[in-house]
Amino acid sequence: MTHLRKMMLEELQRRNYAETTIRSYIRIVEDFSQRFHRPPDRLDPQQIREYQAELFQKRKLAPSTVTVYLAALRFFYTKTLKKGWSVAETPYPKRAEHVPSILSQEEVARLIDAARTPFHRTLLMTLYATGVRRAELTHLKITDIDSQRMVVHIQGGKGRKDRDVMLSPKLLQELREHWRRLKRKPSEWLFPGHRHPTNDRPISTKVVWQACRNAAQRAGLQKQVHPHTLRHCFATHLLEQGADLRNIQVLLGLNDLEQTTIYLHVSERRLNATASPLDSLKLQEKSPQAE
C-alpha cells in the first residue's frame, strides 16, 4: 500500500464512509494516476480537466458517474492532501433528467406472480412493499423486522443513515412463510446466501437483479425492470394513493429538496398511518414450498 493510498484510506475511514464508497474512491484516484503515469499529488487542475473530458468523450460515462469520479478526486485533494479545489475550474457536470420507468400496479402484480421461485417472489415483494435499495434489502437482518411496531428497520442506509419503513401486513405474512420454507434457519440474515452452507452471509445484489430480470421476462413486460424500478413504483404509487410527499421522502431515505445533509424524520404515528402499496395488489395464492 502506497503512502498516499494509506493516507486517503485513513481519511475516508475516519469520516465513516461506506466500504463501497471507499473502494470506489481509491480505485478512481489510482485510475487517474495511471492515466498520466504520475503520482496523483503531482497532477494539477489541468490534468483533472483532461481526465474529465476523457471520461465523457472516450469512455462515454454518464454525467452522474463522472460526478462520482470528480467527488473522489476532490476528496483526495482537499481532505487527503489539504489542497484547494476550484469548483470553477472543474465544475460538476449537469445531470440529465431521466424520467424513471414506472410500472402500473397491475404490472407489479404480474411481475411478482411471475417470480421464478418463492424466494424470488419474497425478494420482489419486499422491494415493492418497502421501497428499499437493493443493497439495503440484501443486508436486512431478522431482528430488523419489528412485528410489534409494524416497521422494518433499515440499518446503515445510503449515507450511513438508519431509518424505519412501514411493514405491510401482507409482507409480514410473506416473510413468515419465507421463514417456514427455509430448511436451514439463519441466525442473522433475513435473506441468507444459499451457496454458503452455514447461512452466515447475505445474498448478493446480483441475486436481486436476477430475480427482477427473470420475473420481467416471464411476465412479458416490455419496460426495463430492475430493483430500483420497484423503488420508484413504491414512491409513485404511494403518491397516487394520497400519501404526503415529505413522508415518502423520509421512507425512501432521501435528502431534502436542497440536497443537504439534513434528513426528515417521521413519527411512528405517521409511519403507521401510511399503508404499503403492496396491500392493494391482487396476487395469486402460492402453495408453500421448501427452499
Q: Each PLM stretch: what is its role?
A:
Residues 1-291:
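Conserved catalytic core of the tyrosine transesterase superfamily
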